[in-house]
Structure formats: C-alpha cells, structure tokens
Swiss-Prot record:
Signal peptide: none annotated. The gene is gatC. This is Aspartyl/glutamyl-tRNA(Asn/Gln) amidotransferase subunit C. GO terms for molecular function: asparaginyl-tRNA synthase (glutamine-hydrolyzing) activity; ATP binding; glutaminyl-tRNA synthase (glutamine-hydrolyzing) activity. InterPro entries: Asp/Glu-ADT_sf_sub_c (IPR036113), GatC (IPR003837).
Length: 95
C-alpha cells in the first residue's frame, strides 16, 4: 500500500500543519514504509493464536481495603465557620 503526495498534502491541510516540498517527499517515504509494515502484520497468520487481554498471566496485587486514617471530623469542624449536626453550613448561593 502506498500513500500519494496529494493524500499527504490533503491531510496536512486538514490537520492545519504546514509542510514544504522536501517534507512531503520525506513523509511520503516514511508513511509508505509504515503502511508496508502494517500490510506485513495484516498478512501474518494468527488463526492458531488464542486471543488475550494481557501478555502476562500476572494478577495485580491490591492492598487490603482497610481504614488507615483516624476520624478527625471534630477537629476539622472545630475550625469551620459554621456547622450543624456534623454538617458544614455554607452561604446560600441560589435563591
């Protein structure tokens, strides 16, 4: 598969990037090589390969779900301007 000079110029316009003649030639070559590699990958026979979600059979070890901090509600509410029944009171912003 190849990409034409016109395709590169069209994509450059759509992407709003400026490319000059030398860059278009280099991009044409580089993108052609990339598309050739994609064609090679597409041609590989993967019928006997079992699909997988991750290449490693490792399971992430999670920490236990336990409380690690003490309850400091009273200390925080002691320095708050206004509280009531354990809740913070704030000024009304919607009438």
């Amino acid at each position: 598969m190849s990409i034409s000079r016109e395709d590169i110029e069209k994509v450059a316009v759509l992407a709003r990037i400026k490319v000059d003649g030398e860059q278009v030639s280099a991009l044409e070559k580089d993108l052609g090589n990339i598309l050739d590699l994609v064609d090679q990958l597409s041609a590989a026979d993967t019928d006997a390969v079992e699909p997988m979600a991750h290449p490693l059979d490792a399971v992430q070890k999670l920490r236990p779900d336990v409380v690690t901090e003490t309850n400091q509600r009273e200390a925080f509410q002691a320095i708050a301007p206004a509280t009531e029944d354990g809740l913070y009171l704030v000024p009304r912003v919607i009438e």
